[in-house]
């Protein structure tokens, strides 16, 4: 559906009427042959180019191209792809899927495959403005129902304006366009394995609604998503980033091309078992006890509801238990893994020895163990309280 009101043209995905032009640009990109060969290894580049040029709507692009790309990623890098909770959502309703965030692209992209496999509509997807660079990325992203989200920066006034604009777009999309949305629970990926919802995200959701704060959240139909990877995407890159942050004051500054490197690494790196848990929607009855709370406390409580869902339904793997035992120096969870699995994880841990000339390897290893062990701490916290 296309809207005459153009106030969201700066962030919205493409309309169907813009797809043909986008496909022409994609087909002529110098990166096209390599992408086509990966997604469609059994076809020639010319055949795929002809197919791309015939696409003139979002649905066909998502089903014929992006769904096939997801299937290839699963085939090449995932040993077991599972999901749960589809019975908790109604295909006729729109939801705001709030997900933990472990991989720049795959957290949202692989969820679309789950939905497509069961004839659910795909979602619109938030995509950081820092990533929406280069014509190919813009065309693929906006043809795939991605919309741009500005990262924090600039003046407080500018950030407020951008947050209000995003909030208005999210509510309009759910209410008027009748489209679901995927958004991460926080700004940027979780680097330390601790999945927590940013209270600022909850505040942003509310900015587009002037009335009752309970109603402002309940009508969004929030559905938490817990995605877990046996092998954490870009885990070594995350370790190095955390290490640098620990040893330098101020905020970590990414190098040119670092986000693209993380995207590509996340796609091709072996991921082992991957599970998506679609959690129970947040309902108004759960929100009502918070109705009289001050605004900041209300936001904290709503974020806590989302965290409880995500951490409780996060599926743990042997790597989590191995890392926890190694970090604690005991064998509390030894029944959850085999000697072979522990050996494989230990070999992966040893790969950090390559950085011995520039870093404290023992600290690097402790950071990596924390990334894998922290989901156990989180699950224990929320299931015992």
Task: Indicate residue ranges for each PLM-predicted region.
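Soluble catalytic domains of membrane acyltransferases
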Residues: 66-70, 75-282, 354-355
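General structural signal for secondary-structure boundaries
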Residues: 16-17, 58, 152, 199-212, ...
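Membrane-anchoring hydrophobic helices of lipid-metabolizing enzymes
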Residues: 1-95, 101-112, 116, 138, ...
